[in-house]
Structures are given as structure tokens and as C-alpha cells.
Amino acid sequence: MIAATTGTSADTYAPDDIDGDIHTVLWPVHSGLLRYCGFDVIEPFIAHMPGRVGPEVRQRYLDDYRTRLFDIVHAPRLFFRPAQDYGRNERLRPGVIARSGVQRNV
């Protein structure tokens, strides 16, 4: 699981916003490093702009992170297509539909 902070609000990490979807931003690490090395990839924990929010929000981030760590075995896993869904060229086989905004059919 990636745990990260951002310098901007959660609103800027939507697919049509300036920073783009957070899953797109993290895709190279999730897919190219963690999944490739055999890890189950857990939904990331993101604390948005902790330096610009009040102490009560920062405390909530810490509490939420603590809860996530204590219950990590039940944390949602990200979906990745199995290897057999890819051809020799490492592209999705014809008829296999991409399931994420990062993994697109072209």
C-alpha cells in the first residue's frame, strides 16, 4: 500500500482535473513495481494537503491511517488483469476489456 500526501485538495485529483486521477498518477508504481514483484496491491492511503488543513483534519488523517493499518488484511485490493489476458506483445488481447481508466483499450 502506498501512503502519500499531496500538496493540493482531493478535488484536483479527479480524471478531468489538473493533477489527474490519483490512480493514474500512481499506476507506474502500483503496476510496474508492486504488482510486478508479486504483491497484492492495496488501495492507496492519501492525505490531501495536510500542511493546509487544520489540526482536527490532520488528526483525522492520522486516525484513518491507523485504522487502515490495523485492518490492512481487509483493505480493498486494486484489480489487475491476469497475465493470460495479454498477448506476446504485452497488450490486452482482442476482446479483453480494460477495467480501469489507466489501462485503456486502444
Where are these regions (language model features)?
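Short glycine-rich His-centered loop
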Residues: 6-10
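Glycine-rich phosphate/pyrophosphate-binding loop and the adjoining helix
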Residues: 11-106
